[in-house]
Amino acid sequence: MAKKSMIIKQKRTPKFKVRAYTRCERCGRPHSVYRKFKLCRICFRELAYKGQLPGIKKASW
């Protein structure tokens, strides 16, 4: 779980556009965030296994 101060800091508009970065909307993790879902890899995996992400299924071949 991310620190609340960092989540609040990230929500402010940065002085320069290149300083903007993505965070997981569920836990606030700044790394490994899928832009399409706005989730980090860990939250994405949990929700996919529970079947809460429509159109996502485990690959098998």
Curated annotation (Swiss-Prot):
Positions of Zn(2+) binding: C24, C27, C40, C43
Disulphides: none
Name of protein: Small ribosomal subunit protein uS14
Manner of cofactor binding, per the entry note: Binds 1 zinc ion per subunit.
GO cellular component: small ribosomal subunit
GO biological process: translation
Subunit structure: Part of the 30S ribosomal subunit. Contacts proteins S3 and S10.
Function: Binds 16S rRNA, required for the assembly of 30S particles and may also be responsible for determining the conformation of the 16S rRNA at the A site.
InterPro entries: Ribosomal_uS14, Ribosomal_uS14_bact, Ribosomal_uS14_CS, Ribosomal_uS14_sf
One Gene Ontology molecular-function label: rRNA binding
Entry annotated with the keyword Flavoprotein: no
Similarity field: Belongs to the universal ribosomal protein uS14 family. Zinc-binding uS14 subfamily.
Keywords per UniProt: Metal-binding, Ribonucleoprotein, Ribosomal protein, RNA-binding, rRNA-binding, Zinc
Cofactor field: Zn(2+)
HAMAP family named among the record's database cross-references: Ribosomal_uS14_2_B
Organism per entry: Geobacillus stearothermophilus
NCBIfam families: PRK08061.1 (NF005974)
